[in-house]
């Protein structure tokens, strides 16, 4: 999965890393996942029509970024100096469990690349280079370069994330990560390379929160793909049974469902058909 870097991080844009640290795993057992997260991730990913409904909002952005005409899931940032620029997603969430993928090439992140959630009131532009998402009480963000969590960052220090990091350590991320927003529990979490990193923020209940990022790198392009969502109602017994069967088979053997001695209608159900 991602890699750990030791030493202080300087506020400079580095196009080519001088050293590629050895890959390493999480310390200890994976933190407990939110209820029903495995169920959500086991479901087929949302189709393009749903992804477009949950895409970046071309009407809710800094003027220095734009949603691409040929790829409505991706925004592009103009190379404007001394400016931090953000964009919100179209859909805000007040209930349910939701997951979306952020694809942000590591070489396009620069000194302040922040991913998180925000209310409709959070600012989307700031003069200078800063961790804009998480800078006030209206947003919650993970600075991908510094491996720090920010909320009300003008008044509160950042917190190391994942939690196993030391005070002078950072976590080098791959190009993609998953954001997990559980509005029923009021938590925000992240998944990297299939590893759940634990709860980043709590206390989000009662709000309506939108996907958001803020960027400083000129010509960076960031893509958001909504994975899926689950309403807060308890899952039906049939869904729980399907999840149990698919878990018993494992991802590598799901293709064997078609050869099981079961009625075709049940095979179809197990394959979300």
Swiss-Prot record:
<dbReference type="InterPro" id="IPR001870">
    <property type="entry name" value="B30.2/SPRY"/>
</dbReference>
<dbReference type="GO" id="GO:0048511">
    <property type="term" value="P:rhythmic process"/>
</dbReference>
<dbReference type="InterPro" id="IPR013320">
    <property type="entry name" value="ConA-like_dom_sf"/>
</dbReference>
<dbReference type="GO" id="GO:0016567">
    <property type="term" value="P:protein ubiquitination"/>
</dbReference>
<feature type="domain" description="B30.2/SPRY">
    <location>
        <begin position="34"/>
        <end position="233"/>
    </location>
</feature>
<feature type="compositionally biased region" description="Basic and acidic residues">
    <location>
        <begin position="12"/>
        <end position="34"/>
    </location>
</feature>
<dbReference type="InterPro" id="IPR003877">
    <property type="entry name" value="SPRY_dom"/>
</dbReference>
<dbReference type="InterPro" id="IPR043136">
    <property type="entry name" value="B30.2/SPRY_sf"/>
</dbReference>
<comment type="function">
    <text>Substrate recognition component of a SCF-like ECS (Elongin BC-CUL2/5-SOCS-box protein) E3 ubiquitin-protein ligase complex which mediates the ubiquitination and subsequent proteasomal degradation of target proteins. Negatively regulates nitric oxide (NO) production and limits cellular toxicity in activated macrophages by mediating the ubiquitination and proteasomal degradation of NOS2. Acts as a bridge which links NOS2 with the ECS E3 ubiquitin ligase complex components ELOC and CUL5.</text>
</comment>
<keyword id="KW-0963">Cytoplasm</keyword>
<dbReference type="InterPro" id="IPR050672">
    <property type="entry name" value="FBXO45-Fsn/SPSB_families"/>
</dbReference>
<dbReference type="GO" id="GO:0006511">
    <property type="term" value="P:ubiquitin-dependent protein catabolic process"/>
</dbReference>
<dbReference type="InterPro" id="IPR036036">
    <property type="entry name" value="SOCS_box-like_dom_sf"/>
</dbReference>
<dbReference type="GO" id="GO:1990756">
    <property type="term" value="F:ubiquitin-like ligase-substrate adaptor activity"/>
</dbReference>
<keyword id="KW-0833">Ubl conjugation pathway</keyword>
<dbReference type="Pfam" id="PF00622">
    <property type="entry name" value="SPRY"/>
</dbReference>
<dbReference type="GO" id="GO:0035556">
    <property type="term" value="P:intracellular signal transduction"/>
</dbReference>
<keyword id="KW-0090">Biological rhythms</keyword>
<comment type="subunit">
    <text>Component of the probable ECS(SPSB4) E3 ubiquitin-protein ligase complex which contains CUL5, RNF7/RBX2, Elongin BC complex and SPSB4. Interacts with CUL5; RNF7; ELOB and ELOC. Interacts with MET. Interacts (via B30.2/SPRY domain) with PAWR; this interaction occurs in association with the Elongin BC complex. Interacts with NOS2. Interacts with EPHB2.</text>
</comment>
<dbReference type="GO" id="GO:0042752">
    <property type="term" value="P:regulation of circadian rhythm"/>
</dbReference>
<feature type="domain" description="SOCS box">
    <location>
        <begin position="234"/>
        <end position="273"/>
    </location>
</feature>
<dbReference type="GO" id="GO:0019005">
    <property type="term" value="C:SCF ubiquitin ligase complex"/>
</dbReference>
<comment type="pathway">
    <text>Protein modification; protein ubiquitination.</text>
</comment>
<dbReference type="GO" id="GO:0005829">
    <property type="term" value="C:cytosol"/>
</dbReference>
<dbReference type="GO" id="GO:0043161">
    <property type="term" value="P:proteasome-mediated ubiquitin-dependent protein catabolic process"/>
</dbReference>
<comment type="similarity">
    <text>Belongs to the SPSB family.</text>
</comment>
<dbReference type="GO" id="GO:1902916">
    <property type="term" value="P:positive regulation of protein polyubiquitination"/>
</dbReference>
<dbReference type="Pfam" id="PF07525">
    <property type="entry name" value="SOCS_box"/>
</dbReference>
<dbReference type="InterPro" id="IPR001496">
    <property type="entry name" value="SOCS_box"/>
</dbReference>
<feature type="region of interest" description="Disordered">
    <location>
        <begin position="1"/>
        <end position="34"/>
    </location>
</feature>
<protein>
    <recommendedName>
        <fullName>SPRY domain-containing SOCS box protein 4</fullName>
    </recommendedName>
</protein>
């Amino acid at each position: 999965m991602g890699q750990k870097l030791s030493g202080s991080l300087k506020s400079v844009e580095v196009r080519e890393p001088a050293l590629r640290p050895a890959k390493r795993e999480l310390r200890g057992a994976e933190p407990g996942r939110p209820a029903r997260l495995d169920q959500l991730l086991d479901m087929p990913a949302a189709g393009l029509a749903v992804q477009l409904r949950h895409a970046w909002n071309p009407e809710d952005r800094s003027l220095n970024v734009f949603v691409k005409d040929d790829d409505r899931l991706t925004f592009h940032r103009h190379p404007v100096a001394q400016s931090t620029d953000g964009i919100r997603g179209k859909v805000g969430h007040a209930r349910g469990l939701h997951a979306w993928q952020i694809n942000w090439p590591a070489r396009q992140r620069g000194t302040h690349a922040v991913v998180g959630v925000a209310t409709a009131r959070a600012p989307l532009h700031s003069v200078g280079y800063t961790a804009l998402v998480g800078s006030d009480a209206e947003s919650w963000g993970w600075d991908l370069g510094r491996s720090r969590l920010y909320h009300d960052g003008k008044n509160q220090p950042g917190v190391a994330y994942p939690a196993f990091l030391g005070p002078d350590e950072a976590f080098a991320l791959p190009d993609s990560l998953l954001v997990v927003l559980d509005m029923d529990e009021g938590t925000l979490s992240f998944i990297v390379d299939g590893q759940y990193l634990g709860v980043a923020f709590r206390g989000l209940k009662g709000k309506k929160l939108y996907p958001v990022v803020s960027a400083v790198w000129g010509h960076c392009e960031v893509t958001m793909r909504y994975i899926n969502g689950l309403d807060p109602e308890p899952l039906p017994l049939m869904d729980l049974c399907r999840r149990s069967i698919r878990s018993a088979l494992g991802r590598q053997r799901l293709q064997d469902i078609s050869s099981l001695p079961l009625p075709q209608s049940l095979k179809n159900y197990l394959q979300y058909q």
